Amino acid sequence: MEPWPLTFLLLLLLLLWLQGCVSGHSNENLYRKVWRREGETLSVQCSYKNRRNLVEAKSWCKVKKKKCDHNFTRSWVRGPSYSLRDDAKVKVVRITMEALRVQDSGRYWCMRNTAGHFYPLVGFQLEVYPALTTERNVPHTHLTNTPMDGFVTTGQVHISDPHAPFTSDVTMFTSEVTMFTSGLLTLASGTTTPTPVTGYSFIDTSGTVTEPERNTESQPATLSPSNARSFSADPVTTSTMSRHQSSSLSTTGTCHPLTPNRSQETYIPAMVVVLTFLPAPVVLVVAYGFWKKRHMGRYNLGSNYAKPWIHLPEGPETPWKPAWSKITQ
């Protein structure tokens, strides 16, 4: 067996495999993706403007086990499972499904009925997510035991530690012993992240700077009279500072930027290019094989071409007689 038929078969199998991959992705593109949450209503439209002015019934079905069920039921809904309205003037079908649940997730088809045969118009892929049961309530911050004669000072605190990649802008409400603080952490890259300071006190220690976790409860920060300092509008330098809480997170690490996720569909154009240009060399190889076999042919010396030459035994030469000798005789 010559090598070029084997190559042709391998390329043919490769083409079939690539065609299967492309057809699989094309089936996904047939459906329009729709996302809803439980309790919401689905309302979609199917257009049939390219159809002639024929009276055709419309239907809405759900794909189950590679079949489209036109009589699917939704037991938790009172009345019909869906409503379908056909506007013949604008040639648009409107389908509505109320009280969605996670069980409604799946693939649906809007079809037309022509003489008992169903033909698809538009496909939809519905994804229903669970409803949000709890909502996050942010409590309001209340200042307790704040005298009326309190004053507000703002300033910028520079941390002397060279490894700390941020500075802290502090806004402080002070009145004798009780005060309230709130600040912003400014990263070295220029990004500001709000970090409310609640539920702990400032203590002078000789450690590193740690950032505590956020506390959902709003409590006023207290400072003992012995450690209370008056902040002026000008920046002041503090040697070391730590924030103590039940669980804390060190901020002396290095920030690594997240790399964006690449799209998973970038290989589709490459596959289309391969399918476009791959058949050309295959056809050229096959055509060259047939042309070579037809025009150049094969040369065979026969079955006796390998036998040695046979030399006949040489006998004594007969004497030469001229032709006129026969006449004289």
From Swiss-Prot:
<dbReference type="InterPro" id="IPR007110">
    <property type="entry name" value="Ig-like_dom"/>
</dbReference>
<comment type="function">
    <text>Cell surface receptor that may play a role in the innate and adaptive immune response. Acts as a counter-receptor for CD276 and interaction with CD276 on T-cells enhances T-cell activation.</text>
</comment>
<keyword id="KW-0675">Receptor</keyword>
<feature type="transmembrane region" description="Helical">
    <location>
        <begin position="271"/>
        <end position="291"/>
    </location>
</feature>
<keyword id="KW-1133">Transmembrane helix</keyword>
<feature type="glycosylation site" description="N-linked (GlcNAc...) asparagine">
    <location>
        <position position="261"/>
    </location>
</feature>
<keyword id="KW-0325">Glycoprotein</keyword>
<keyword id="KW-1015">Disulfide bond</keyword>
<dbReference type="GO" id="GO:0038023">
    <property type="term" value="F:signaling receptor activity"/>
</dbReference>
<dbReference type="GO" id="GO:0009986">
    <property type="term" value="C:cell surface"/>
</dbReference>
<feature type="region of interest" description="Disordered">
    <location>
        <begin position="202"/>
        <end position="259"/>
    </location>
</feature>
<dbReference type="InterPro" id="IPR052314">
    <property type="entry name" value="Immune_rcpt_domain"/>
</dbReference>
<feature type="signal peptide">
    <location>
        <begin position="1"/>
        <end position="24"/>
    </location>
</feature>
<feature type="domain" description="Ig-like V-type">
    <location>
        <begin position="25"/>
        <end position="126"/>
    </location>
</feature>
<feature type="compositionally biased region" description="Polar residues">
    <location>
        <begin position="217"/>
        <end position="259"/>
    </location>
</feature>
<feature type="topological domain" description="Extracellular">
    <location>
        <begin position="25"/>
        <end position="270"/>
    </location>
</feature>
<dbReference type="GO" id="GO:0005886">
    <property type="term" value="C:plasma membrane"/>
</dbReference>
<feature type="topological domain" description="Cytoplasmic">
    <location>
        <begin position="292"/>
        <end position="329"/>
    </location>
</feature>
<dbReference type="InterPro" id="IPR013783">
    <property type="entry name" value="Ig-like_fold"/>
</dbReference>
<feature type="disulfide bond">
    <location>
        <begin position="46"/>
        <end position="110"/>
    </location>
</feature>
<keyword id="KW-0472">Membrane</keyword>
<dbReference type="InterPro" id="IPR013106">
    <property type="entry name" value="Ig_V-set"/>
</dbReference>
<feature type="disulfide bond">
    <location>
        <begin position="61"/>
        <end position="68"/>
    </location>
</feature>
<comment type="subunit">
    <text>Interacts with CD276 and this interaction enhances T-cell activation.</text>
</comment>
<dbReference type="InterPro" id="IPR036179">
    <property type="entry name" value="Ig-like_dom_sf"/>
</dbReference>
<dbReference type="InterPro" id="IPR003599">
    <property type="entry name" value="Ig_sub"/>
</dbReference>
<dbReference type="GO" id="GO:0042110">
    <property type="term" value="P:T cell activation"/>
</dbReference>
<keyword id="KW-0812">Transmembrane</keyword>
<keyword id="KW-1003">Cell membrane</keyword>
<keyword id="KW-0393">Immunoglobulin domain</keyword>
<keyword id="KW-0732">Signal</keyword>
<protein>
    <recommendedName>
        <fullName>Trem-like transcript 2 protein</fullName>
    </recommendedName>
</protein>
<dbReference type="Pfam" id="PF07686">
    <property type="entry name" value="V-set"/>
</dbReference>
